[in-house]
């Protein structure tokens, strides 16, 4: 049976006829749903953490079929769903029912408006004369700012030292970065040179709660002891960066913000407004913590279609003089076409099953980045991306992806760099690569630029001086069970709170 209004379907599901009246022109039917549960989303082992908070919230909505106002108590809730209680004798919810406008009301007149669907209904006390029903609601849509506030409230209720996108004192944040050693001498010189521009960028990211950025903070007596952030850097990809923790609390506090991050991904990735099809990060292979967490998770998942790692060589190219116009030799540089990207995808297929390129928005069928770039522009931030093909005798030798963003958006400047994919180093020279990068630098008015080179061996073959190596880690959140299984084991071993998915004493708000 399908019930709808002029705008949308309100209910669809199998029903049995309990009774009906007879009549030639009209009849009345009493129907009963045959199922107590629907499968709205793919079943996962690691679901959002359900919390009971006090005083209990309520939900208020206009019933889509009767038009009557309904108010129900909330039993538990998470970042992507909640459970409510109603009487079995007077129940009004059934699995499959859409609730186009539902207000979730918390203490202190805090209210979140969302769209939801009933996904299950079960009897809680069968033997009681006044038996009750527990009905589960899946959140389908909510305002972006409301979602950040709502999930942040749940994080803080679970651990009063955990914050999501809270107001951060910028002087304290910079002091924290210095004290943790996150900003080392080489990075300090870069920051000091561009300090005013970087300061303005971080004011925007940390005080205006933009849709493109999230930050997770662990505080002890008001002092920042751990930090991690995410930014939507490609159309459907979020970049994890700036993970740091303080002093003797490094391990535990670092794990805490990592747990927040994993929980946020679970709660958020299926909402369309998040545009979170992929999550990625870069780390140095000699850094033990990210290697253990991200590298270990990748090995544990052991499926490059769901999680993969790719090693890039890193160098910095400078344009030493105005006379250096970029000598390409026998090569030609042009805007990359779809056929060039298909050839790149074929080249990279063996290493990451295409996941790395999809995360970088470089696969042939990738969407354009107009919407995301406009989000940056509305905030007064810069975001540009262009892709070029370097060819010799019409044979594709390399692809160059140029990312431009505000200086310091990522403090390793990996959001403001050239990524070089070398398909055939035998048709290239070091001078041609240098010339291509210099040409791009001049056209974009850049004095120097970081360059990431893939595969790593290409830098060695072309005798390009390599300063360091970066590992790019990519994950499909839809298949994140393996990641959570691995990190939960580490969280259990590294914290005194036990399993993050185990039941806990209900916190107060």
Residue ranges and their predicted role:
Residues 398-475:
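C-terminal structured domain segments
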Residues 206-251, 391-427:
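Conserved donor-binding loop and adjoining core beta-sheet/short helix segment
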Residues 239, 256-269:
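Aromatic (often tryptophan-rich) hydrophobic motifs at membrane interfaces
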